[in-house]
Amino acid sequence: MDGSILYPLNALKNSHPEIYAEHVKKYEGREQLLTAEIQPLKCLWNDVLHFTAVSPQELKVNLAKAGIEIGIVQDWYKVPVSIIQGENSIAFVYRRDQSVIPNLKEYETFDPEKMEVYRKVPEETIEYYKERNASGKRPLLFHIVPHILYKGSIDTKNLEIVSA
């Protein structure tokens, strides 16, 4: 895509319908997320940008532990916390008693002091990767991994790019 602005999925629906159509496919089988409300931010699940504090290198290592090798190198934006903290951000930290489709009413204020908590990949995630690999199904990379959600768009022009 041309440009340097990172938009939430729903913002692409009218401005870039072909890109929206490509990325909305990620929700096949989980369509209820497309209309799920994030009450603290007064918006929908796809009205926000989704971030993780987990490094792309660690994601690859955890996938490899599950027997999944990613043969391509991908680029990821490293977004400074200062850009996403504040009233337009929230953390979604999965609770152990939740199903594959989480209770989207359980959020906590995004706290930069808790980055170590947000960086932790739960053992359940690695087990999930193993189960999906064994069944020949593609895993959701961020299943049970804490999410940092930001209501807004971000200019990526001056952001560091991390390859993994």
Locate predicted features.
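Active-site-proximal loop/hinge segments that shape catalytic or ion-binding/gating pockets
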Residues: 1-50, 56-164
